[in-house]
């Protein structure tokens, strides 16, 4: 449905919606306008609020704030902060997105997570004192939505949705847009949906969705970028795509231009004392009380505006924070993540997952050990044999932290898109497919999204999505498989339970960078592997072409003494199998 249609529906529904009188004589009345239809559980509700008291700065909750207490039928009460916004419209002029500002106002976004009648008690405060009140009753009805992403507490290795549906992430980074702005995401997300991609990563930074970046931004958030993020999150939701939202990145601490000739934003940062902030040095971002207070206010705004999106997978505090450890202290960074993680968890009514990330090839154990960090991440660049990397890192990180693990950035070279080193995209293919066969919570997240789109490399994702459809991937009983016999020049990877397994065999001759320039690798025959730890008896085996995402042949096998012998048909580069106990 188009945004304009949604807006019309909202306006037309307003006369049928509820508006509350003041709760007492000393407070004015807030007018709450919301759609007339009953929302489904996990369907975002937008409430326009008028009657707010005038204030000098609508972004400072110490000056003026809007909050709702929502009492659910179960008796659970959550607090949902409201936010000030400005509407925009967009158009393309000369290949560049141009925004035109529109109406301003206050809004509450709320996500019902159970059916039944919910009572919303809304209040506006001015300098900490109640200035206006309103109440509303909204009934949520059962629907088909699966809920929010959580850690599967049964096995701790995977994600799941609230209704228990297993969640394996098949995606890539799409961190910012180009000159076409949100129009880029219209194209990228359409292609993602067609390819079965269910997960992307966005950054809030100066080039795209950042709201507090420059000298004049302190507590004066950028409404144009906020509107862009609204639109992209809504489009991703419509396309069935989850989003990990990265709130900051290492460039805010850089002073000198980096390898790419930029990313040195500390001289412009609003928390920098040179710009009227409270931080003389970059590390004071993590230790200064005023800086923390400002960041908590920004987090409140972020939660108010975007936590109600059910496709928000996680908040990621920082991208590659240790890129700037020359001017930062790791202990202070960890303490900040602990404290702000607790703060964020406490104000987020949906309790989305939380994480953070380090530079390529780096790991800092004490941060991921924090209970405030729900999953661990690794960025892989310039590493040979991506499937082995994925298997080794997944096993090590899981053994260390007992949390889901993601390779959330991947590339054959951190310096840029280098197709000459991977002309047939085997590294990309192997990084993607290996994620599904090593116990990782998702595929490796390729970094070079614009190049991937222009080269139409989405079939690598769609083939994997087709293979995984209908499997049990993400179930708590599926764990990295073990093989005790390997013959015929293959590397085996897999996940298995006693009665189900997914197996992927990689020809060693094209294990990137080996054989990278070989356009047509020879057909591999005579491979044999033995999968262990399975129930005895008859098994069905489906062999799949991984380039096309299609079944090529079915076979039968018999397990004895917990061992299942697999003999694939002839294949080129790699082949996958779906196995199930009869």
Where are the regions that the model predicts?
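Extracellular glycoside hydrolase catalytic/binding regions
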Residues: 297, 304, 321-468, 522-524
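Short, hydrophobic beta-strand segments
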Residues: 49-51, 106-113, 568-570
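Aromatic- and carboxylate-lined catalytic core of secreted/periplasmic carbohydrate-active enzymes
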Residues: 32-33, 37, 54-56, 413-416, ...
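Active-site mouth of glycoside hydrolases
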Residues: 63-65, 125-127, 143-387
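Non-catalytic, glycine-rich low-complexity segments
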Residues: 24-74, 80-82, 86, 137-141, ...
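Boundary at the C-terminal end of the N-terminal hydrophobic targeting segment
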Residues: 19-23
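Extended acidic/polar, glycine-enriched regions
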Residues: 76-78, 83-154
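Bacterial N-terminal signal peptides
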Residues: 8-18
């Amino acid at each position: 449905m188009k945004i304009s249609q949604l807006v019309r529906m909202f306006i037309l529904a307003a006369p049928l919606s509820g508006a509350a009188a003041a709760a007492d004589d000393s407070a004015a009345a807030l007018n709450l306008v919301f759609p007339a239809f009953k929302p489904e559980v996990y369907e975002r509700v937008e409430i326009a609020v008028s009657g707010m008291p005038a204030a000098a700065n609508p972004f400072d909750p110490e000056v003026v704030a809007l909050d709702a207490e929502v009492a659910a039928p179960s008796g659970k009460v959550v607090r949902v902060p409201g936010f000030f916004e400005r509407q925009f419209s967009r158009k393309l002029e000369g290949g560049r997105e141009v925004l035109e500002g529109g109406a301003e106002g206050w809004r509450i976004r709320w996500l019902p997570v159970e059916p039944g009648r919910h009572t919303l008690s809304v209040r506006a405060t001015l300098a900490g004192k109640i200035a206006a009140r309103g109440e509303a009753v909204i009934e949520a009805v059962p629907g088909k939505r699966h809920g929010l992403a959580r850690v599967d507490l049964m096995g701790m290795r995977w994600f799941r949705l609230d209704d228990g549906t297993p969640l394996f992430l098949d995606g890539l980074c799409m961190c910012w847009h180009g000159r076409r702005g949100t129009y880029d995401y219209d194209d990228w997300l359409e292609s993602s949906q067609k390819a079965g991609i269910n997960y992307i990563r966005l950054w809030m930074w100066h080039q795209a969705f950042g709201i507090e970046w420059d000298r004049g931004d302190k507590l004066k958030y950028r409404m144009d970028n906020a509107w862009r993020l609204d639109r992209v999150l809504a489009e991703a939701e419509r396309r069935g795509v989850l989003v990990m939202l990265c709130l900051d990145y290492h460039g805010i601490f850089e002073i000198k231009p980096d390898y790419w000739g930029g990313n040195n934003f500390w001289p412009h940062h609003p928390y920098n004392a040179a710009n009227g902030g409270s931080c003389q040095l970059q590390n004071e971002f993590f230790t200064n009380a005023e800086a923390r207070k400002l960041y908590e206010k920004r987090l409140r705004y972020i939660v108010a505006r975007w936590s109600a999106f059910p496709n928000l997978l996680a908040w990621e505090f920082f991208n590659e924070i240790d890129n700037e450890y020359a001017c930062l202290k790791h202990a202070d960074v960890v303490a900040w993540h602990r404290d702000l993680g607790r703060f964020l968890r406490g104000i987020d009514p949906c309790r989305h997952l939380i994480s953070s990330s380090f530079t390529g090839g780096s790991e800092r154990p004490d941060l991921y050990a924090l209970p405030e960090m729900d999953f661990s991440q690794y960025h892989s660049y310039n590493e040979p044999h991506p499937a082995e990397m994925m298997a080794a890192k997944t096993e090590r990180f899981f053994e260390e932290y007992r949390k889901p693990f993601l390779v959330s950035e991947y590339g054959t070279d951190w310096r840029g898109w280098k197709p000459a080193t991977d002309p047939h995209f085997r590294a990309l293919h192997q990084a993607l497919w290996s994620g599904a066969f090593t116990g990782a919570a998702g595929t490796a997240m390729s970094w070079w999204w614009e190049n991937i789109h222009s080269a139409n490399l989405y079939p690598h994702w769609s083939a994997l999505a087709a293979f995984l459809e209908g499997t049990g991937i993400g179930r708590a009983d599926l764990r990295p498989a073990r093989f005790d016999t390997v013959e015929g020049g293959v590397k085996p990877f897999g996940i298995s339970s006693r009665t189900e397994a997914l197996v992927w065999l990689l020809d060693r001759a094209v294990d990137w960078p080996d054989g990278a320039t070989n356009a047509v690798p020879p057909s591999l025959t005579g491979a044999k592997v033995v999968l262990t730890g399975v129930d005895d008896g008859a098994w069905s085996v489906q062999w799949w072409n991984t380039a096309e995402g299609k079944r090529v042949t079915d076979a039968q096998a018999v397990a004895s003494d917990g061992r299942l012998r697999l003999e694939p048909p002839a294949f080129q580069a790699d082949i996958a199998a779906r196995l199930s106990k009869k």
